C-alpha cells in the first residue's frame, strides 16, 4: 500500500481531500497538501490533520522527522479526473509526457473531461488530451 493510499481515506474521513504528498529523502520531511470543497484551508484545519496523521504514521511505523500539512495554494495541482471536473472553466498550465502537435506545454481553459480525455481550449484551439499523458497540471490563479 502506498503512502497516498494509506492517508487518503483517513483525510477524507475528516472531511478533507488529499491533494498531494511530497517526501524528501526517506525519513526526513513529509509534506501533505489538503483541500476542502467549501472555503479555504485554515491553520486549525492543518493542525487537526497534522495531529491525526502523526498518530496514524506512528501506528503504521512510517519513519519521518518532520510533518508539514498545508493547502495546495492558489496554483493547485490537478492530479485526478475529479480535479479537472471540479475546476472546469478555469485556466491551467499543462505539461504532457508525450508531445501533442509537436508541443508538450500548454496554457488554456479546462473545457470538459469525458472518458479520461481532457478538452483544453488553448488559444482558441480545442485540444483532446488523454489524462494518462499528463505529466503535470496546475491551476493558474486569478489575481
Curated annotation (Swiss-Prot):
Listed GO CC annotations: cytosol
Pfam families: DUF150_C, RimP_N
Coiled-coil regions listed in the entry: none
Record GO biological process: ribosomal small subunit assembly; translation
Keyword terms: Cytoplasm, Ribosome biogenesis
Annotated NCBIfam families: PRK00092.2-1 (NF000929)
Family the UniProt entry places it in: Belongs to the RimP family.
HAMAP family (UniProt xref): RimP (MF_01077)
Protein's name according to its UniProt entry: Ribosome maturation factor RimP
Organism: Nitrosomonas europaea (strain ATCC 19718 / CIP 103999 / KCTC 2705 / NBRC 14298)
Source taxonomy: Bacteria, Pseudomonadati, Pseudomonadota, Betaproteobacteria, Nitrosomonadales
Gene that this sequence comes from: rimP
Amino acid at each position: 500500500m502506498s503512502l497516498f493510499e494509506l492517508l487518503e481515506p483517513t483525510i477524507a474521513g475528516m472531511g478533507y481531500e488529499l491533494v498531494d504528498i511530497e517526501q524528501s529523502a526517506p525519513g526526513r520531511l513529509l509534506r501533505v497538501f489538503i483541500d476542502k470543497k467549501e472555503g479555504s484551508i485554515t491553520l486549525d484545519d492543518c493542525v487537526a490533520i497534522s495531529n491525526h496523521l502523526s498518530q496514524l504514521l506512528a501506528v503504521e511505523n512510517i519513519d519521518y522527522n518532520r510533518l508539514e500539512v498545508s493547502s495546495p495554494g492558489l496554483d493547485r495541482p490537478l492530479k485526478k479526473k475529479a480535479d479537472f471536473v471540479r475546476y472546469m472553466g478555469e485556466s491551467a498550465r499543462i505539461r504532457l509526457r508525450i508531445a501533442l502537435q509537436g508541443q508538450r506545454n500548454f496554457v488554456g481553459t479546462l473545457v470538459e473531461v469525458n472518458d479520461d480525455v481532457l478538452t483544453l481550449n488553448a488559444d482558441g484551439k480545442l485540444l483532446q488530451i488523454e489524462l494518462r499523458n499528463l505529466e503535470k497540471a496546475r491551476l493558474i490563479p486569478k489575481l
